[in-house]
Amino acid sequence: MEVFLEMLLTAVVALLFSFLLAKLVSVATVENDLSSDQPLKPEIGVGVTEDVRFGMKMDARVLESQRNFQVVDENVELVDRFLSEEADRVYEVDEAVTGNAKICGDREAESSAAASSENYVIAEEVILVRGQDEQSDSAEAESISSVSPENVVAEEIKSQGQEEVTELGRSGCVENEESGGDVLVAESEEVRVEKSSNMVEESDAEAENEEKTELTIEEDDDWEGIERSELEKAFAAAVNLLEESGKAEEIGAEAKMELFGLHKIATEGSCREAQPMAVMISARAKWNAWQKLGNMSQEEAMEQYLALVSKEIPGLTKAGHTVGKMSEMETSVGLPPNSGSLEDPTNLVTTGVDESSKNGIP
């Protein structure tokens, strides 16, 4: 199933990539077509206007030419029947020619008048500029003539007096600033001392609180370590007994899977491995048993493991307790009699004699 999904995903990704590539290519071609069509439009317009202008010029030249009039005269001489009509036409053509001549003359007169007006304006501008230059020269000469040595001395005296006044004002401001700065410095030092004392007190209080919390946490950790060690010992003994006794085969399949999941949680924690393939049936069943427990704590998993073992094999846990007690007794007997205990030395001697008599030592 997963292989089929992967193949389907690759096919969909390939189709999407090809579609995007085709879309980009089509957009690029459309932009190129638009950019190639844009510069042709003004060229077409320019060509049309030039053709129109050229046609107008040709018409005007034909009307102003003299060869046409000569040809008309010859035609009039050859044809006698239409003398009146041809004469009328010649008269009209003459009027048109004279009208065009008048129009040309008017245009030349207007252009000459415009040129003369422009020249007049330029001349006026030149005159105005010259007048402004003369006025500026006269003003400079008057200012130079008005500057006398007496006026210069008076201006220097005034400037010196103003400089002295400004220096006195600055010195007064500096003195005021220095006096005010001393006061501000003293006040700021007092504020800093107060803040530093408050900060020291707060830091001391925080350090004391942290020490208290650390002590309480260490005490809790010590107690938790003792409890966990006992639970872990019982769990390890049950697991070893279950493996050595060979009674795991007597347990049902569901209970066996549940024991496997609890053992995984107690030893490795919550399940973080990937799901195995559907072909691996046993591995998938074990993974499901492990995943089903979720985020169960290791202590809870150990307790449930012991409870399930005692339920499925009742005598196994009792044997485990007896074995644990025997190991504890062996460790207690192996200790020396004066290993830091606060018992009476006479009792220690009597206990040693009793133990030697039991073991058959004279």
UniProtKB/Swiss-Prot annotation:
Protein name: Acyl-CoA-binding domain-containing protein 3
Expressed in which tissues: Expressed in roots, stems, leaves, flowers and siliques.
Keyword Transcription regulation annotated: no
PROSITE patterns for this protein: ACB_2 (PS51228)
Subcellular location: Secreted, Extracellular space
Primary residence: secreted
InterPro entries listed in its UniProt record: Acyl-CoA-binding_protein, Acyl-CoA-binding_sf, FERM/acyl-CoA-bd_prot_sf
PANTHER family named in the record: ACYL-COA-BINDING DOMAIN-CONTAINING PROTEIN 3 (PTHR23310:SF122), ACYL-COA-BINDING PROTEIN, ACBP (PTHR23310)
Transmembrane segments: none
Free-text function comment from the UniProt entry: Binds medium- and long-chain acyl-CoA esters with very high affinity. Can interact in vitro with arachidonyl-CoA, barely with oleoyl-CoA, but not with palmitoyl-CoA.
Coiled-coil ranges from the UniProt annotation: 192-221
